[in-house]
């Protein structure tokens, strides 16, 4: 059986109070940026969207979205790496008998520019999902300066995942 899941996430971004080197974490990769993400965890919108896509595809009772498993009201998730969230969810879907066929992620932002980091992002996501890099696509787009992304008020990501049930 094949299953498909879709995920979306958004976080506010803001100029840091102190000047200096800042980064935004995207797909588990630190990308230099003049903005910081306002979030409870590390704010990796791409991995958060991926977690929701994985959970949506697997339809595991009691764990159908990121907020159920890792609520932002729980202090134990404050500053937590989103890679941990993906690893935990991969364990859940593997226990449920699923493997990942492929994942496609789109990051929507005016900043940072991610072209030079895409290959590293693909590899990081592939490693987290226990698949080959060729099974992962990461791309970015802007909104042509429209909306909150265009005004550099936030960053968003979409993810779609295909799973195959290999055992009951």
Curated annotation (Swiss-Prot):
Keyword Lyase listed? The answer is yes
* One MF annotation (Gene Ontology) recorded for this entry: 2-C-methyl-D-erythritol 2,4-cyclodiphosphate synthase activity
GO BP annotation list:
isopentenyl diphosphate biosynthetic process, methylerythritol 4-phosphate pathway; terpenoid biosynthetic process
Residues with site note (Transition state stabilizer): 40, 142
**Self-association and partners:** Homotrimer.
Q: What family is it from?
A: Belongs to the IspF family.
Stated name of the protein: 2-C-methyl-D-erythritol 2,4-cyclodiphosphate synthase
The organism encoding this protein is: Neorickettsia sennetsu (strain ATCC VR-367 / Miyayama)
